[in-house]
């Protein structure tokens, strides 16, 4: 998704001016402010909707006197801290990272849904001053989006987060080591702004090595390394993910990791072990439990 879909009110000019007066690394502080960010995003279905992190990158160089900031919602694969999240309408996170005498880079990784976050700073030329600290978010992860395949609508519902973890196993197994992440638009999950049900729009997103198409509550993934015309459609039915291959070529790949049902589709749920990838899947689950 394009960054212009998100409007982030990071700081005021007065706050930046105040930060620039800091003289040493010891004065850097992480402030929680009553500052809201507005998320403007299109509608889309449940698939992977609760499975992303927020990465914020900040860089300050005194000779330019500017802050460079960016934010992205990324569906991250097994090797990249895959976590689920719940994005609120507003975030109360603010970083003062300006150092007038030397360059400094900072990276803030907030896994909102699992109540954890990392602030990591790096002051060039002085390794002893590098430090890392944790931050606890007050976001409630219980209000998640649910997809209804029967009428192509979505709404709010409280349910277990465990099923949302499993989609990363599927994508990482299908995708191998080609791309570590891809971006998806994220729906505003503020309950006050969500009607009981909304129609989903068909949308095409191109990111790195994949094309992602979504229609109603089903999403179709086209992996470039498979070649043109090969894809897999993923939907949610009865508490499990249903994967429909476009042809026998894709079906053969799914045979390596999932079992086929009577209708020729492949199902994936938390009770099913991946064929031929048991060790990798187990390693990922342990990592997820550790981080969540």
UniProtKB/Swiss-Prot annotation:
Record localization: Secreted; Cell outer membrane
Composition bias type Polar residues, residue spans: 273-286
Disulfide partners: 19-292
Pfam families named among the record's database cross-references: SPAN
UniProt entry tagged with the keyword Glycoprotein: no
Annotated InterPro entries: SPAN_dom (IPR056746)
Keywords assigned by UniProt, alphabetized: Cell outer membrane, Disulfide bond, Membrane, Plasmid, Secreted, Virulence
Topological relation to the membrane, as annotated: Peripheral membrane protein
Region: Disordered, residue numbers: 129-151, 267-292
Gene Ontology CC: cell outer membrane; extracellular region
Role summary: Required for surface presentation of invasion plasmid antigens. Could play a role in preserving the translocation competence of the ipa antigens. Required for invasion and for secretion of IpaB and IpaD proteins.
Family: Belongs to the SpaN family.
Protein name: Surface presentation of antigens protein SpaN
Organism for this UniProt entry: Shigella flexneri
Encoding gene, per UniProt annotation: spaN
